[in-house]
Amino acid sequence: MKNTTNVKTVNKELSINELKIGRCYRAKKPRPAGQFASYANDRQIMRIGSTTVQYDGPSVHARRHYPTISKEKFLAWASHDVTDELPPGEWQIWPIPKS
């Protein structure tokens, strides 16, 4: 008889050491963002300080300063690194296509 026990897959949480400048991260609960077109509200890390992360993304309006938040808040927001999934030099169009 086949074992049909349900096994939950647990997503690995990001750690502070995994955050890298220039990489893009997706939200745990993605939302649409952008001024003229809808994109996923991904964030690209521009700078990492001792306790803060400065980022860019479709939700950051043109000619505005890059927002800075604590590393803990960024990690609470971020689900995973999506840099390799994105078209080169572009943001992910909303809605996100199902794989």
Question: What are the functions of these language-model segments?
Answer:
Residues 2-20:
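Mixed-charge, Lys/Arg-rich low-complexity intrinsically disordered regions
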Residues 4, 59-99:
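Intrinsically disordered, low-complexity, charged/polar segments
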Residues 9-13, 41-42, 76-79:
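Short, charged low-complexity linear motifs
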Residues 14-35:
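Short coil-to-beta transition motif at edge beta-strands of beta-rich domains
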Residues 16, 21, 45-49, 65-72:
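Generic alpha-helical hydrophobic packing signal
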Residues 17, 28, 56, 94-97:
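A structural detector for beta-sheet-dominated domains
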Residues 37-66:
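Basic/aromatic-rich interaction segments and small domains that mediate binding to polyanionic partners
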